[in-house]
Amino acid sequence: MNNQGRSILAWAALFIFVILLFNVFQSDGLLGVRNNITFSDFLTRVDERTINSVKIQGRVIEGTSNDGSTFSTYSPDYPDLVNRLTSNDVNIEVVPLETRMNTFLGFLISWFPMLLLIGVWVFFMRQMHGGGKAMGFGKSKARLLSDKGPKITFKDVAGIDEAKEELTEIVDFLRDPSKFQKLGGKIPKGCLLIGPPGTGKTLLAKAIAGEANVPFFSISGSDFVEMFVGVGASRVRDMFEQGKRNAPCIIFIDEIDAVGRHRGIGMGGGNDEREQTLNQMLVEMDGFEANEGVVIIAATNRPDVLDRALLRPGRFDRQIAVANPDINGREQILKVHLKKIKYNSTVLARIIARGTPGFSGAELANLVNEAALIAARLGKKEVDMHDMEEAKDKVLMGVVRRSIAMSEKEKRLTAYHEGGHALVGLYCPAASPIHKATIIPRGNALGMVQRLPETDEYSQNREQMESSIAVYMAGRVAEEIIFGKNKVTSGAASDIKGATNIARAMVTKAGLSDLIGPIFHGSSSDDMYGRQQSNEISEATAKLIDAEVKKIITQGYEFAKDILTKHIDQLHTLANALIEYETLSGQQIKNLLSGRALDSEEENKFPFNDAHTIKIDKEKLHEKTKTTKAQKENIAS
C-alpha cells in the first residue's frame, strides 16, 4: 500500500476513535455501568426503604441502594416525588443540567470543529505537496516515468518515419554522446513536435521514454499556472533543477501552448502570471546557466500561437512536423493496431488504408477498436472486412439514429436530395468519388453522401473546387426540380455553408478570381485578445468579393441544374433505389445507373461519354454567369 493509502487509513482510524470516545463519555462508561430500572420499580424500592440516596438532574435520576449497587431511571412530571423520597429517609442531591456533561467531553465537543478543520487542512497539504510540505505550491508536478509496466518503443510507432528518425538521433546522443562530440556536435536543447491532433505526438514521447535509458519526466503545460501568483515560475525553476540533478534526462511538456502563447495578447492578472511563467521558461532553456544533458521535448497542435522567443534555435533547435500519414503510413499503423485484435483473412490493411485518406493515427486506432466492438456485439469470434466497413461508416458518417421515424414524404425528399448530390458527383470529372449514399439518419443529418478521394490530396485546383461547389448545391437543386421552388427545405443549409466557404476561399485566399486577382483578403494574425483579424479592405472591394463569391456559387448551382435536368430519369432511378435499399455504395450506384446487377464487381467507368458534353456546357454556364464590365462599374460605384 502506498503512502497515500496509509494516510487515509490513519485519518479514518482517528475519526472512528473520536466517535467511540464521544459515545463512551456520553454513556458514562468510564464511571461504571448503571442498572436501568423502570420508574414504577423505583417507587416500589422507595416505599420499601431499600434506597439510600439519589441524584436528580432534570428528569434523570441516579441512585444508590442500601447494598451499594447503583441504578438509574427516568422520571415523568411527578410533583409528589420529593415528598415521597424525604418521607422514606432518602438522601436527595439535585444537580444543574449544565454540569452533567463530562469536562473532557465538553472540551472535546467545543473544540472539535476547529480541530476538524485543522486536520482536513493538514491532510490536503500532505496529499497535494508531497507529504507534509505545506508550502510546497511551487514544487514541480513533473512525473518521473516508472520502469514498471509495459513499455512503448519505436516499434509501436508507425507511419511517421521522418519524426522517428529525428528523435532516434536524440536518443542515441543521450545513450552515447561521445559519438557526436568527436565532431564537435552538441546535443539539441529542445525539440518541438508540431502536428494536428491524433497524429502521434504524445505516443512518440512515450516511445522515447521506452527507448532512452535515461530518466524521463513528463508534465502538461496546464500544470504550471494555478491560483497563486508566482507558482508557475517557481515550478519551472524546480522542474529544471530536478532535471539537472538527474542529467542526462528528458523533460516532456505536453500541450505547451497552454503556457507558451504570445506575450502581450491578453490583459489581467492571470495573463501576467502566464507571461511570468513563460519568461522563466525562456531563461531556464537558454539563459546564463547551462543545462547540459537536459533535453526538452514539447508537443503542440497550435504552433501559430507560440511566442517567437520560445521557437528560436537555442531553445527549440528542432521543429518536427508530425502530419497525418499517407497510404503507406496508414497501412503500417493499421497493422500495428490489428495485432491487438482477432481478425480473419478478409481484413486487408492495404484496402482499409486506401479507403481512409486523411485519417490520423488516433482515428485509425479508433476505427480498428470500433470494428472489434461491432464484431463482439454481433457475437462473432473474429473481425471481418464487413465489420471494418461498418466501423468506417460509423467514424465517417456518425452513429445511426434508429430512434428517428421518418415519414414517407420525408424519406422521399431525402432520397432525391441525396440522389442529387450523388448524381452530380458522378458527372463531375474532378469531384472525389462517391463512397456511399444513405438516407438513414446519422449524426445530425437525415441523409448523407460520403465522398472519398482516391489518393491523398495536399492541394486542390480550380476544377476540383468548382466541382465540390456543384456537388454541394446539387441537393437543393434536386429538391427544386422535383418538388418546386416553394417546397425547398432547410436541409441544404449546411451544403450552402460548405459551398460558400469554398467559394470565399477561392476568391480571398487562393487568388482564383479573375476579377479580384491573386491578392490575399483572408483573415490575418490574432489581435491582442486572441481573436482573428480580417485584412483591412475597402467597401468597394468587399462588394466585389461578395459578387465574385455569388457568381462562383451561382455557376455551380447552374452546373448542377444542367446535369440533373439532362439526366432526370437517372435521378428518379437513384432516388427510388435509395428509398428501397436506404444505403448504396458508390459501386452500386454506378451499376444501377449503367443497367448492371446491383452487386456486380466488374469495373465500371461511369459516366461513359457525358463528361466532355458536361464540360462544354460548363463553359457555356461560365459565359452566362460572367461579370460584365458594366456590372463591375456598378458594383464599384
UniProtKB/Swiss-Prot annotation:
UniProt keyword list: ATP-binding, Cell inner membrane, Cell membrane, Hydrolase, Membrane, Metal-binding, Metalloprotease, Nucleotide-binding, Protease, Transmembrane, Transmembrane helix, Zinc
Compartmental location: Cell inner membrane
Q: Where is this region: Disordered?
A: 617-637
For biological process, the GO terms are: protein catabolic process; proteolysis
Q: Which cofactors, if any, are listed as required?
A: Zn(2+)
| UniProt topological domain (Cytoplasmic) ranges | 1-6, 125-637
SUPFAM superfamilies for the chain? FtsH protease domain-like (SSF140990), P-loop containing nucleoside triphosphate hydrolases (SSF52540)
Ranges annotated as spanning the membrane: 7-27, 104-124
* Highest taxon above the source species: Bacteria
Q: What is its main location?
A: membrane
Q: Which InterPro entries match?
A: AAA+_ATPase (IPR003593), AAA_lid_3 (IPR041569), ATPase_AAA_core (IPR003959), ATPase_AAA_CS (IPR003960), FtsH (IPR005936), P-loop_NTPase (IPR027417), Pept_M41_FtsH_extracell (IPR011546), Peptidase_M41 (IPR000642)
**Active-site residue list:** E418
Membrane topology, record value: Multi-pass membrane protein
GO terms, molecular function: ATP binding; ATP hydrolysis activity; ATP-dependent peptidase activity; metalloendopeptidase activity; zinc ion binding
Q: Which GO terms describe its cellular component?
A: plasma membrane
**What residues bind Zn(2+), as annotated?**
H417, H421, D495
> What quaternary arrangement does the UniProt entry report?
Homohexamer.
Function text: Acts as a processive, ATP-dependent zinc metallopeptidase for both cytoplasmic and membrane proteins. Plays a role in the quality control of integral membrane proteins.
State the family named in the UniProt similarity comment for this chain. Answer: In the central section; belongs to the AAA ATPase family. In the C-terminal section; belongs to the peptidase M41 family.
Name recorded for this polypeptide: ATP-dependent zinc metalloprotease FtsH
